[in-house]
Amino acid sequence: MTKDDDQEFKIIRELKENAKVVWSDFSLFENFTGTAAPKVVKFAGINANDRVLDVGCGTGVLALTAARLGAKVVGQDLTPTLVERATENSRIFGLEVDFVESDVEQLPFENASFDCVISQFGHMFAPRPSVALSEMLRVLKPKGTIAFATWPPELFMGRFLKINGKYGPPLPKSAESPVLWGDVKVV
């Protein structure tokens, strides 16, 4: 490993630690992210007893929507506060969903352990989309379904993220823009 590699990993680690703080107050985003959940679940074709992983689950809106159909759902998020809120929401709604704190770039699940991997915006903030996608596909069963909601680059949030990337803290060389997930040519 070179000195540049060490620096790159250090920056990525710092990005993830900062993300835990930034996303711990998700209340600003809840109002305009929840409406996508039923659409993602329907698009994914989730059925009762499917094993489903919600990547970057936030407060659990998407995971709970899938659980209402009888799916066996695990919600994953990097931010401890969000995992706690998702767990509390699961209890309030009387739904059984396992929520775990983990990194999408190193998912703590066996290969081919989910029928469906879903995400509602959370996945797109992994600093290295190719690593995140590789992990999502690793835990997906053969012929499984992957479905997610993301903001396209040309709409408000995509433009906001582009400006933030330009003037925000420096990103590691391997980091890619979150809006790439919304570009059909890339995905």
Per-segment meaning from a language model:
Residues 2-50, 61-65, 82-85, 89-93, ...:
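Conserved class I S-adenosyl-L-methionine
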Residues 45-47, 68, 127, 141:
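Short conserved AdoMet
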Residues 51-55, 59-106, 131:
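Class I SAM-dependent methyltransferase SAM/SAH-binding core
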Residues 105-116:
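A short acidic, Gly/Pro-enriched loop at the edge of an enzyme's catalytic core
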Residues 116-129:
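A short SAM/SAH-binding and catalytic strip from SAM-dependent methyltransferases
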Residues 130-131, 137, 141-187:
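Conserved catalytic/acceptor-binding region of the Class I
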